[in-house]
Every structure is written in structure tokens, then in C-alpha cells.
């Protein structure tokens, strides 16, 4: 069975909110993503010690280099994630297409993806509109005090 995730991550890969702000954001997300049965979906808040991949999973079909605009082979990215277990000390990698350094957060994914040390996610949302609206994402950003990026994943 497949799982679907809708996540919000900071636009700065190293930024983390306060625990209090994260708890307030979680409470807000639970209100806008109600789960009447209490068993279908799961809301999680994660503070990561290292920069962590938060990608679109099976939705990713194409990655483009921010330096030379050539396609980056998906198997290169999959190998990178496997080798690092999706965790990074540095936000920079050497891309295979032009053998230059690029920021992880600068890689151009066809489905929004990112890298972060904080994530708030809803697994298998049950409401009709499964992603955050612009207003909802903006409200979470205001609670946390930092701009956010939305990631829709199919795992």
C-alpha cells in the first residue's frame, strides 16, 4: 500500500523553530486536517540533527542541475540518498552533469522537494483537499516565524 505525505519545511535548510512554535503549528495543522475517526492519518513534527531529504518520493520524475540546466540522472540521486541515508552535514554536493558543487536546496525537482532540519507532515490526509492551501501554509509559516515550502510525497 502506498502512503501520501504533505509536508511543510523551512526554506533555509538549517533553520529550526522553537519547540513552543512547533507545538503551536502542530495544533493548527491538526485543526485544519481533521481526522474524525482518529485512525486514518498521522500528523508529525520532526526536528532533525542533520540536514535531511524531504522529497516527493515516487512523484519525482526529473531533477535538473542548477548550474548547467542539464538533467541529473535519477539513479544518481537515489544512490546519494541511499549512501547518506538521506542525511547530510553539508548542504552542498558535487553534481554529476558538470562536476561542480551545488546546494542541495538548489537542485530543481519536477515535484517540489527539499532538505531541512525541521518538518511538519500529515501522512495519508483524509480531508478532500489533501495539500495545504496557500492560506494554511502561510498561517503555519507565521506561527513558526519562517517561510516554508510544501512537499507532496508518494512513498
Task: List each language-model region with its residue ranges.
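Domain-exit/linker segments immediately C-terminal to small folded modules
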Residues: 96-155
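Short linker/helix segments within small regulatory modules
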Residues: 79-95, 110-111
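Cys/His-rich zinc-coordinating "finger/knuckle" motifs
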Residues: 72-75, 105
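Residue-level signal for mature regions of secreted extracellular proteins and peptides
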Residues: 56-61, 88-91
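Short cysteine-rich clusters marking metal-coordination/redox-active sites
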Residues: 65-68, 95-98
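Short linear interaction motifs
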Residues: 45-48, 76-81
